[in-house]
Swiss-Prot record:
Subunit structure as annotated in this protein's UniProt entry: Homodimer, and heterodimer with apo-SOD1. Zinc-binding at His-16 of CCS1 and 'Glu-43' of apo-SOD1 is required for this heterodimerization.
Cofactor note text: Binds 2 copper ions per subunit.
Name assigned to this protein: Superoxide dismutase 1 copper chaperone
Extra remark beyond the main annotation: Present with 12000 molecules/cell in log phase SD medium.
Species per Swiss-Prot/TrEMBL record: Saccharomyces cerevisiae (strain ATCC 204508 / S288c) (Baker's yeast)
One of the GO BP terms on file: removal of superoxide radicals
GO cellular component, one term: cytoplasm
Family: Belongs to the CCS1 family.
Membrane-spanning ranges: none
Disulfide-bond pairs as recorded: C27-C64
Length: 249
């Protein structure tokens, strides 16, 4: 990423005083690409202007013993997300089993440039995985029902780190860009596969391990200030606990 790829993102993070703010600043001070940090202690919100992947911000804070939830990124109608699930059944661990294998956070930073923060966790084979966007958002039959490849990413996702979901499982992450506006992505499917050929809707092409999800709009910066979900009645931190339990990180 370049300095021209900067965008603003807001994060919910527990803080109660200036000492909390100073601890957060110290935690993030060595992360390259952060231009500015601003804090609202009363609302427990941190605003970050940077060219850094949201997952990097969140993971860095977690390594310092703090948690954070991204609340919004980019301008209105410029952000999206896809929760990536496998349609191939196997058990990881009875206590940790989940269909989720990854997450793609998406934010547009220019008229024709969008960033993709991709995390993968719990894949059964170490190695390079490959991302693509398919023309349809029908995931009822896995990759087979998503149609043709609409855009493919040439850079691989390197998954060689041990996963926290169980033995012989692997994780990885990457931060990619594409010359696409976010509005063209909504409703399509985001697919990650072990296959370099980016499998399409042919049964013979989905033998390689793959996982996918529908791309949905997400909040822009300052568009989401809810503290309690109207659907579940849970606080954002209770929902965060549920998300982590389902491998949404």
């Amino acid at each position: 990423m370049t300095t021209n790829d900067t965008y603003e993102a807001t994060y919910a993070i527990p803080m109660h005083c200036e000492n909390c703010v100073n601890d957060i600043k110290a935690c993030l001070k060595n992360v390259p690409g952060i231009n500015s940090l601003n804090f609202d202690i009363e609302q427990q919100i941190m605003s970050v202007e940077s060219s850094v992947a949201p997952s990097t911000i969140i993971n860095t804070l977690r390594n310092c013993g703090k948690d954070a939830i991204i609340r919004g990124a980019g301008k209105p109608n410029s952000s999206a997300v896809a929760i990536l699930e496998t349609f191939q059944k196997y058990t990881i661990d009875q206590k940790k089993d989940t269909a989720v294998r990854g997450l793609a956070r998406i934010v547009q930073v220019g008229e024709n440039k969008t960033l993709f923060d991709i995390t993968v966790n719990g894949v059964p084979e170490a190695g390079n995985y490959h991302a693509s966007i398919h023309e349809k958002g029908d995931v009822s039959k896995g990759v087979e029902s998503t149609g043709k490849v609409w855009h493919k990413f040439d850079e691989p996702i390197e998954c060689f780190n041990e996963s926290d979901l169980g033995k012989n499982l692997y994780s990885g992450k990457t931060f990619l860009s594409a010359p696409l506006p976010t509005w063209q992505l909504i409703g399509r499917s985001f697919v990650i596969s072990k296959s370099l050929n980016h499998p399409e809707n042919e049964p013979s092409s989905v033998k390689d391990y793959s996982f996918l999800g529908v791309i949905a709009r997400s909040a822009g910066v300052w568009e989401n200030n809810k503290q309690v979900c109207a659907c579940t009645g849970k606080t954002v931190w209770e929902e965060r606990k549920d998300a982590l339990a389902n491998n949404i990180k």
